[in-house]
């Protein structure tokens, strides 16, 4: 997909916030396969709470940007989120996932990577922040796929004061994959379901059609098996900390229904649909793909202000 800037004016609103620069400190987490690198964003405040920001799927870096195989998408969503929270007296830690950008040295061979590796990394950061006397409390925020990672890292973890699901899926990954391919011919849909059924049962599939090799290549199947074990509805129900579920109503990647499924699974959770916010946390008044794509490639467009206000109220309640 080539991202166009046509129509970007539809996504710029005066309600967005201009923030001053925050102080940043580089930090790293040692793992058996190498260092994972991140940045702490510090507000001008004494002993602030800190929020661990966990990015979504794919080659997404700590700032919320993608740069892989000749495809670049810079929107600075997580960096802008960190800056906005710093203005409100809240510290953040965002990091490059193992194998991505500055954490590329911590990569595992694809066939050795498991979903639990990302969970363990998040738990490592939580431990690190919990031991840092500069911060009053540790909160976890997971965006998109990072929501499930953050949930799992927070279950039975007394070091986590509260959890925030931001545009997190409410269904298992295999359901989402099958939905995304629902427009394909019936034969393809049948093959995908058959492969997924095997992977859900913990069985790798050897005969993958060439057209599905990118999605189900043999080296990624162990990771998919590990990912498919988790249903976000079941995981979020195990959380004992305060939980905030946030979803934008102009998100074309994750639906409001996903957020509602999470809320149904944990009725006591706080829940808010944010008006005119899309998947990269920007103000956008349209679900038209050309307009949406403009925000995905605009690093100067601020994040939605109500998002910052809602997170601040939750963290400082």
Indicate residue ranges for each PLM-predicted region.
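Single conserved hydrophobic/aromatic residue that forms the stacking wall/gate
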Residues: 1-14
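N-terminal cap/lid segment of alpha/beta-hydrolase-fold proteins
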Residues: 16-46, 50
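Short, surface-exposed "cap/lid" segments of acyl-processing enzymes
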Residues: 45-85
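Alpha/beta-hydrolase active-site loop
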Residues: 77, 110-132
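Primarily recognizes the serine-hydrolase "nucleophile elbow" in alpha/beta-hydrolase
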Residues: 127-181
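Accessory cap/linker subdomain of secreted extracellular hydrolases
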Residues: 164-234
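Short beta-strand/loop motif that positions the catalytic acidic residue
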Residues: 239, 245-247
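Catalytic active-site module of serine/aspartate enzymes centered on a nucleophile-bearing elbow/loop
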Residues: 277-281, 286-317
